[in-house]
């Protein structure tokens, strides 16, 4: 059991550096909400929907500073939640290592020294922003908003599953990394 834990890859968000791609006003227009009474709730739902979408596609929609840990590598590996804007550092067992960035989204790393242990990469993702992602987030926010009070103590969850059209929109962005 301990051996398996030592072999686990880990990813951590150090900070969120970007902004939401869907504004509260835009989501309210989409949902035809004219009052300001629910602005805070809708804002939180936008963040929740965006995070769900990011986890579904394994890509950052809003730019973030991340740290990725790999217990061992053959020298070539992919960074999760690309595209990558910049790499701050790569260390192996606490020592800086030289590397080459490969790929269209700067997500593939090749360590110049080959295989390495205890590799830690700190990097910044650039995020994604286009109308399809905005549409998926707005549809999901609308589902959350319309079902915000649909809870009952005798059922596990009354909220409808994620709308199929949201998944369909996101499938073209989906990375098979995680």
Language-model features: where?
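Divalent metal-cofactor coordination and adjacent catalytic microenvironments
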Residues: 1-178
């Amino acid at each position: 059991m301990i051996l398996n834990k030592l072999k686990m890859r880990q990813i951590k968000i150090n900070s969120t550096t970007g902004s939401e791609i869907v504004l509260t006003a835009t989501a309210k227009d989409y949902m035809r909400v004219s009052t300001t009474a629910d602005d805070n709730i809708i804002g939180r739902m936008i963040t929740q929907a965006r995070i769900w979408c990011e986890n579904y596609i394994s890509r950052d929609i809003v730019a973030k500073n991340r740290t990725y840990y790999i217990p061992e590598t053959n020298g070539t590996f992919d960074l999760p939640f690309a595209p990558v804007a910049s790499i701050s550092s790569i260390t192996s067992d606490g020592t800086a290592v030289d590397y080459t960035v490969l790929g269209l989204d700067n997500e593939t790393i090749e360590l110049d020294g080959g295989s390495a242990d205890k590799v830690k990469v700190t990097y910044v993702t650039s995020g994604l922003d286009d109308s399809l992602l905005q549409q998926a987030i707005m549809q999901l926010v609308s589902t959350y908003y319309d079902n915000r009070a649909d809870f009952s103590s005798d059922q596990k969850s009354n909220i409808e599953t994620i709308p199929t059209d949201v998944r369909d929109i996101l499938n073209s962005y989906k990375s098979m990394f995680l």
